[in-house]
Amino acid sequence: MALARPRPRLGDLIEISRFGYAHWAIYVGDGYVVHLAPASEIAGAGAASVLSALTNKAIVKKELLSVVAGGDNYRVNNKHDDRYTPLPSNKIVKRAEELVGQELPYSLTSDNCEHFVNHLRYGVSRSDQVTGAVTTVGVAAGLLAAASLVGILLARSKRERQ
């Protein structure tokens, strides 16, 4: 038995699980979402595919959620409602619809699909995926530096004992 899909409401953020990342869209009614799709997107590759790293432009598209999600799982995820006050749903939808067809700047780190939908819903452009990736890189760099320092100190100690 298949799991029931969530029933989004106007202006809801939709998180679509892709392999290794999430694609984001905003629900605008009648089964449709508005989302930012990199211009390099290949049909069937999924929005914000790995190829999105190669482009600096994206198109705002209005498509059926079922088409954008394909076989991937999705969920309503208004994750910042406790931090930011969402704009009225009619305003979110109006703003999203007005952008359909426009080409916008795109960057994985500063202007991606998550930034886009958060700006529409909250008026705040942010991406937790980017923040998480930067934190992970920072922690990894810190661990590498610490390991290097320990290695240097151990080598120095060994030389001094000889």
UniProtKB/Swiss-Prot annotation:
Gene3D superfamilies: endopeptidase domain like (from Nostoc punctiforme). One of its GO terms (biological process) is lipid catabolic process. The active site is at 23, 35, 113 (acyl-thioester intermediate). Residues 155-162 are lumenal. Keywords: Acyltransferase, Cytoplasm, Hydrolase, Lipid degradation, Lipid metabolism, Membrane, Transferase, Transmembrane, Transmembrane helix. It catalyses: a 1,2-diacyl-sn-glycero-3-phosphocholine + H2O = a 1-acyl-sn-glycero-3-phosphocholine + a fatty acid + H(+); a 1,2-diacyl-sn-glycero-3-phosphocholine + H2O = a 2-acyl-sn-glycero-3-phosphocholine + a fatty acid + H(+); a 1,2-diacyl-sn-glycero-3-phosphoethanolamine + a 1,2-diacyl-sn-glycero-3-phosphocholine = an N-acyl-1,2-diacyl-sn-glycero-3-phosphoethanolamine + a 1-acyl-sn-glycero-3-phosphocholine + H(+); a 1,2-diacyl-sn-glycero-3-phosphoethanolamine + a 1,2-diacyl-sn-glycero-3-phosphocholine = an N-acyl-1,2-diacyl-sn-glycero-3-phosphoethanolamine + a 2-acyl-sn-glycero-3-phosphocholine + H(+). The chain crosses the membrane at residues 134-154. Residues 1-133 are cytoplasmic. One of its GO terms (cellular component) is cytosol. PROSITE patterns: LRAT (PS51934). It is a single-pass membrane protein. Residues 13-129 form the LRAT domain. Belongs to the H-rev107 family. This is Phospholipase A and acyltransferase 2. The lineage of its organism: Eukaryota, Metazoa, Chordata, Craniata, Vertebrata. The gene is PLAAT2.
